[in-house]
Regions:
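Basic, flexible Lys/Arg- and Gly-enriched helix-loop patches that mediate nucleic-acid binding at interfaces
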Residues: 1-215
């Protein structure tokens, strides 16, 4: 069960169906002791391995919610192997449904807490395409701490202006907190609008550029 094949009762059914072998021998008794480090365990002829914790880097696409279940939309768990779903993985933090980029899925609650705890001030870097021209004055406002329209004060953040045209900007934003729709609201406070948002990093994790959207 700890290998992600299902619940204990589901594994018992697999054993009865003679679909599991240990060191080349069919096992039907769930009480048989095995050592996952030395014994070869096969399910339908494929080797399975015991992993206490699972870590999955995903390039989340738009249109998918960062949740374990949702009645209206496809979730990020719908994009991964069901085997990992059975191991209890969950998304670490949330990306808006129309935001894409780096998302970590794991069943390591301690790591998730370290990455998400406000006390840890883990830096996250986003790249945004903005309708409107972001200015050095906007960067200064970010550095001082943007005040949102509802009066919420944001921690000081870093705004790097990568390029601008007459009516559009490409920027990178470095945040150490994660308020609801924060990047969009901070840019809105400067009188501009985010039209595309991608997360590039989360602490030491950097999005693997070889991952296609949804991988």
């Amino acid at each position: 069960a700890d290998c992600g094949l299902g619940t204990r009762s589901e594994v018992k059914s697999l054993l009865k169906a003679k679909r599991i072998t240990v060191n080349g021998k069919v096992v039907t008794n769930g009480k048989v002791q095995v050592n996952p480090e030395t014994d070869e365990i096969l399910f339908d002829g494929e080797k399975i391995q015991y992993e206490e914790f699972v870590y999955i880097m995903m390039n989340k696409p738009k249109g998918v919610v960062s949740a374990t279940e949702d009645n209206l939309h496809k979730t990020v768990l719908d994009l991964i192997d069901p085997l990992y779903f059975k191991k209890g993985v969950f998304p670490v933090g949330r990306l808006d449904i129309d935001t894409h980029g780096l998302l970590l899925l794991t069943n390591d609650g301690e790591l998730a807490h370290r990455l998400l705890s406000p006390k840890k001030h883990v830096t996250k870097i986003y790249q945004a395409r903005v309708e409107g021209v972001m200015t050095p004055e906007d960067a200064t406002a970010f550095e001082k701490g943007i005040v949102l329209s509802d009066g919420t004060e944001c921690m000081p953040a870093r705004l790097d202006i990568l390029s601008t045209t007459q009516d559009e900007s490409i920027v990178q934003i470095h945040l150490k907190e994660g308020k609801f729709h924060q990047v969009k609201r901070m840019v809105k406070a400067c009188g501009k609008t985010v039209v595309d948002l991608q997360r590039l990093t989360m602490g030491p994790l950097k999005l693997d550029e070889s991952l296609a959207l949804g991988e």
